[in-house]
């Protein structure tokens, strides 16, 4: 992440934004699946992880001759990561024990043709017709692991208290 913060050439953004990126060197360290792993909801563990991320950032910022990050963020929704490793997203619980995952894909994508031929349910993007759709929405049934914590298992106050810990 510290190395990534050195990649500040954005020709489509203003010079002021480049300066801002170089000054702040924001760093995102993803801790996803928190409601699937009780240990990463432990405030003491989170504090240790935060301190380690800051320590490593400081070390590599010095090696690269750049500013240390002004903010190290350790919680992101991490939608793609959570789907890849089958865990809850970021600091959120899973939606439900069973749900439909919808994925958008180009009508010209070879993967779309293969999935369509395999019988995966697919629908044209909202506002498009089946005949001239450029984007389709695929639907995949998902079953959460047995014992997974879902949104109806955690009250609003408990969610807020957890947010305050990771904030």
Regions found by a protein language model. Give the residues of each.
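Catalytic alpha/beta core of large soluble enzyme barrels
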Residues: 1-13, 23, 77, 84-167
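Short capping micro-motif at the N-terminus of alpha-helices
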Residues: 70, 83-84
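Internal maturation/activation junctions in enzymes
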Residues: 8-18, 26, 31-77
């Amino acid at each position: 992440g510290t190395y990534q913060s050195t990649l500040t050439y954005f020709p489509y953004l203003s010079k002021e934004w480049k300066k801002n990126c170089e000054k702040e060197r924001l760093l995102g360290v993803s801790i996803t699946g928190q409601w699937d792993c009780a240990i990463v909801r432990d405030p003491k563990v989170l504090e240790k992880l935060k301190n380690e991320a800051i320590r490593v950032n400081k070390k590599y910022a010095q090696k690269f001759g750049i500013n240390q990050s002004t903010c190290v963020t350790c919680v992101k929704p991490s939608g793609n990561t959570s789907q890849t490793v089958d865990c809850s997203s970021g600091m959120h619980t899973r939606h439900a024990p069973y749900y439909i995952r919808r994925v958008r894909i180009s009508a010209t994508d070879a993967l779309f043709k293969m999935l369509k031929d395999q019988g995966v349910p697919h629908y044209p993007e909202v506002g498009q017709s089946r005949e001239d759709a450029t984007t389709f929405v695929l639907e995949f049934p998902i079953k959460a692991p047995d014992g997974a914590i879902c949104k109806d298992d955690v009250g609003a106050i408990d969610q807020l208290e957890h947010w305050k810990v990771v904030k």
